[in-house]
Amino acid sequence: MPLFSLGGMRFQQSWTDVPPEQIEAASQDNLRRILERAVACGLHHIETARYYGSSERQLGDLLGLVPDPARILQTKIPPVQDPAQFEQELSTSAERLRLAERGERIDLLSIHGINNRELLEHTLRPGGCLEVAQRWQSEGRVGHIGFSTHAALSEILEAIETDAFSYVNLHWYYIRQDNSPAIAAAIARDMGVFLISPTDKGGHLHTPSARLLELCAPLHPIVFNDLFCLSAPGVHTLSLGAARPSDLDLHLEAVSLLPRAAELLPPIQQRLEAARRQALGDDWLNTWHQGLPDWPDTPGQINLPLLLWLHTLLEAWDLESFGRARYGLLGNGGHWFPGRNADALDDTVSEAELLAVLGESPWAAEIPAILRRLRQRLGGQMVKRLQQE
């Protein structure tokens, strides 16, 4: 497994599943250049998904033209209640990728988006989606089976501890390390660990704040985050979503600096942590997460843990672009990004109703004002998931 995986959710022409005659030559020419550079640089792993619009179809038309004997092909299919529907989607992916024509298989098949216990049940129940995947595996049409997840830590651990999967795709970056126990659990089971979208979900590092650029110097924030992630025990590969060949450049710089990670990372980490402490204080950093109800148990389904995390990122490192995108997605992300933002406060949710569920939080008195400031700074823009846009 290479250190970087070429992610297939940035290079495609469209997020809608366009027919082949509508795929433009310019889009295919761009993708071919990306594939050729990826092969030349050792990015042998390609990761796409059934619902990445035209991604699978475009890849299927080009993989035979850009040969790579070391290629590892991964696609992802979401779990559903009806396993026949799951198998139909799997067949469609294999067809779009034109595997039979090349005598190839899906090397890595992910059950895509096990984000709650209901979806885990659809996957694991007798006769469910996992059994379909395992049948394809026994027939030689699938190599290894894993899962991708945006779930809460407890649910990720539950899925890992089933011992049903060979690898996991999850979120873990410098700005978000709460899934560390999941990585440890995966290591204990000799599972592969794939980090999802470290550049985008790691803080919009493609458009970093001036503050973050200053704190990460002399490295670009992308390079710093890549080095941090790749230096972590148990992390095997990072997704690199490229819209053009040059999008590989900073990530390849990180690879070249990996032997110096122990020298380069500590001073940057010290500056980042000092900035957090100066902006927020140790009391907040040590205790802000304590006593917060989960979003289903909060009036208006306000996702307090996530919103207060965004507040911390905003105050410490000015991650406004990232914060605005995450804030706007709350309420529109379904099980991929559950809960709601603070817009309901003072509207359908009163301060008294909110305080009633914050009895165990040491910051109960401050939280309503924090949410109002966050709403003022980040609100006003509804955001949809890329597939919805």
Q: Which residues fall in each region the model found?
A:
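N-terminal binding-site loop/beta-alpha segment at the start of enzyme catalytic domains
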Residues: 1-71, 357-389
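A cross-family glycoside hydrolase active-site/sugar-binding cleft signature
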Residues: 5-9, 47-49, 74-76, 109-112, ...
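Conserved, mostly hydrophobic/aromatic
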Residues: 6, 38, 46, 59, ...
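Glycine/proline-rich, positively charged
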Residues: 15-26, 36, 82-183, 187-199, ...
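Structured C-terminal cap/extension of enzyme domains
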Residues: 36-39, 181-389
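Short beta->alpha linker loops
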Residues: 50, 54, 78, 150-151, ...
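Alpha-helix-loop-beta-strand connector modules within alpha/beta enzyme cores
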Residues: 56-75, 129-140, 195
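Short hydrophobic/aromatic-enriched beta-strand-loop microsegments
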Residues: 70-73, 164-172, 259-265
